[in-house]
Amino acid sequence: MTQVTHSTFKAARRSWGVIPLLALLMFFAKTTLALAATNNTKPVVINDATSGAGTPVSTPVPADIARIRQRGELIVSMLSTDTPPFFFEKEGRLVGLEVDLARAIARELKVDIRFNREANSFNEVIDMVAQRRADLGISKLSRTLPRAQIVYFSQPYLTLNHALVLNRVAFARLASNEKLEDTVRQFKGTLGVIAKSSFTEFAKKHFPMAKVIEYPNWNAVLDAVNNGEVTGAYRDEFEIKRLLKNNPTAVLTLRTVTLKDLEDTLSIAIGVTDPTLLAFVNQVLSQQPDKLDIHKVLNALKEKP
């Protein structure tokens, strides 16, 4: 912008006199107005989100959150097999504790939700997230070291102890005169687990002397225990307690052991390229007013029609 300084004014007065000086001042004024009009083609916007110069500020949205918002829906991978009270079909609608949790996350993101139930195993749920075919994996997923190499895990939303259900006759032969604790810790029998589940890995780690046999589903594992095909089955305490609640007479042929020093932490799987989504999910979990525990899960099972 052109400026008229005091020295310029004095010099012009000495050289030109009053009338020429007035003409010069008028020229400077017109020039200044013209420059101002040229430099301010856009009006100054004043609102709550402006920079120091009054320019509107646009807050960038991280790529992982932007992807979900642009799509308009959160895609959640969930196991194809119903697992009440976590997720199951009721009157044609998917419901359950984990379904409610997934809907809460979508609600906070202000998008719709779509459940993808193509996965036939827990590991396939993890794979779908790792391959970016789903934003989240919510399916009673345990955190394991191999899984943590291909996905992020949220903070746990439920912690359960590990547990065994044992065939009484087969276990008695195995235990002989040993103490129960010693026999369990040095378990040398056969142990049934669900194939492609976290407990396949847990069994090999915590019971290295056992012969681990994989079955396609939990019912097949329980059949093997009841028939004496395996000495015991290995899973979390909820599944073992559910077994006894559904069939109280099972205590006549089966015995259970809860492993208090081994925990199964259930978490949400998130893609490794989605760090902001991970932080967001953790924040949603931390703000949940009603934290889950084994008692609430068992009560929810009781309420299921």
Where are the predicted features?
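N-terminal secretory signal peptides that target proteins for export/translocation
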Residues: 1-12
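Bacterial N-terminal signal peptides
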Residues: 19-30
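Ligand-binding clefts/hinges and TM-proximal coupling segments of bilobed small-molecule sensing domains
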Residues: 42-58, 194-207, 254, 284-305
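Extracytoplasmic small-molecule ligand-binding "clamshell" domains
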Residues: 44-140, 149, 214
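Periplasmic-binding protein-like
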Residues: 80-81, 158-165, 171, 237-286, ...
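Bilobed "Venus flytrap"/periplasmic-binding protein-like clamshell domains
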Residues: 81-83, 94-108, 163-217, 237-239, ...
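Acidic, polar ligand-binding/catalytic clefts
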Residues: 103, 107, 112-184, 254-261
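A ligand-binding cleft/hinge motif common to bilobed small-molecule-binding domains
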Residues: 123-124, 140-149, 205, 219, ...
